[in-house]
């Protein structure tokens, strides 16, 4: 029996194996839970490599390619797929959606391969090895999976333009100069402008019909031609107020710095003056006390001299 006809499926490894001995033992894990695949010899190799669910996954891959093509304006997707060249969408291989396990690759027809696309995108989303992909894709999680893969949390371009900015767009009159230049047609509806009709002019000088550009700006804050974003009307005032607050803050800080620099000197000068005053007062008080003491001593001496001069005797009580 050839190796092709002896192809078995190991339920433990969850893959097809070729038994090299008579014993029904997997050559990879050594387990005995193997089952012979009942297929014809002419289609054995091709059917082992290509699972029947590949057709379903290829259909799902085609659906995803169409959804990605519709969202080609998305910068992140464009940057991610741009390196693959102009054939990036057509060269996408069939997708294998799985979750919770390590990625793996399976060979498909025409030398293609199945690539892992989502690894546990969300709880309950994905298929594990050995499960039937058809049971999952037609199950209750299909809408949730498609919504996550088609929208996800990718960047969707500029946010909507503010209503004040839309109302502030100038309205101009179409002249012969416009009709003779590249601005003769509206970039949205491709209709030619009529002479002396009104049009909305963007800050980038591209002009549009009002009915064409306003619905676009309600969803995208950018010019459809050059992608230049529409500035917010309050940005200038907010910038000016921020500059004023910054200027006032610097002035207040400068004033505080000046006062903080001057204050120690004023404090030192004031302290020195007060110290000098206290010293002078102390010296004056001490000097006054000294003069008062001198005057008292002089008065005592003067009184003592007067007493001695009035007595006039040598100390005897009687004169002879």
Swiss-Prot record:
Tissue: Expressed in seedlings and in flowers.
GO MF annotations, alphabetized: ubiquitin protein ligase activity; ubiquitin-protein transferase activity; zinc ion binding
PROSITE patterns reported for this sequence: ZF_RING_2
Top-level EC class: transferase
InterPro entries tied to this protein: RNF126-like_zinc-ribbon, Znf_RING, Znf_RING/FYVE/PHD
Catalytic activity: S-ubiquitinyl-[E2 ubiquitin-conjugating enzyme]-L-cysteine + [acceptor protein]-L-lysine = [E2 ubiquitin-conjugating enzyme]-L-cysteine + N(6)-ubiquitinyl-[acceptor protein]-L-lysine
Gene Ontology BP, a term: response to osmotic stress
Compositional bias of kind Low complexity: 232-249, 295-308
Superkingdom, natural source: Eukaryota
Protein name: E3 ubiquitin-protein ligase RZF1
Organism: Arabidopsis thaliana
